[in-house]
Amino acid sequence: MENQKQYPMTQEGFEKLEHELEELKTVKRPEVVEKIKIARSFGDLSENSEYDAAKDEQGFIEQDIQRVENMLRNALIIEDTGNNNEVQLGKTVTIVELPGEEEEEYQIVGSAESDAFKGKISNESPMAKSLIGKKLDDEVRVPLPNGGEINVKIVNIK
């Protein structure tokens, strides 16, 4: 049997995926079935754009259901170790770009629940890879997409 990719995530991320799956199965799937039913009533399916669009949408929804089910089945829940001295998956880290004083806060999560707009960065991102394993007051070099790098200081871990 082939090894399945594991998806590290917080308990909150796991519950969010469970909610997404429930929504897909109980709301989205029935909605698209109804759209298909209505489109079929228009007659000739060979030139029925509403039917084609609804079938395409159904395919996307079924793919989403499979994707979320796979992620839940292979989820690796991140337990809080209570160690706030080292940056780890699931921890929230506050950094300051050097030289400077402006603080930025990020929670390091699995790729399945990353959301940069909410300050949740993937453990696979260059920033997280640079920070994981580092300690409070460490200065860290973080690679940038353009090939450059920035220096940051870890000022808080929680």
From Swiss-Prot:
The keyword Coiled coil applies. Residues 4-75 form a coiled coil. Keywords: Coiled coil, DNA-binding, Transcription, Transcription regulation. One of its GO terms (biological process) is DNA-templated transcription elongation. GO terms for molecular function: DNA binding; RNA polymerase binding. Gene3D superfamilies: Transcription elongation factor, GreA/GreB, C-terminal domain, Transcription elongation factor, GreA/GreB, N-terminal domain. The keyword Coiled coil applies. Pfam families: GreA_GreB, GreA_GreB_N. Belongs to the GreA/GreB family. Necessary for efficient RNA polymerase transcription elongation past template-encoded arresting sites. The arresting sites in DNA have the property of trapping a certain fraction of elongating RNA polymerases that pass through, resulting in locked ternary complexes. Cleavage of the nascent transcript by cleavage factors such as GreA or GreB allows the resumption of elongation from the new 3'terminus. GreA releases sequences of 2 to 3 nucleotides. NCBIfam families: greA (TIGR01462), PRK00226.1-2 (NF001261), PRK00226.1-4 (NF001263). This is Transcription elongation factor GreA. It comes from Staphylococcus saprophyticus subsp. saprophyticus (strain ATCC 15305 / DSM 20229 / NCIMB 8711 / NCTC 7292 / S-41). The lineage of its organism: Bacteria, Bacillati, Bacillota, Bacilli, Bacillales.
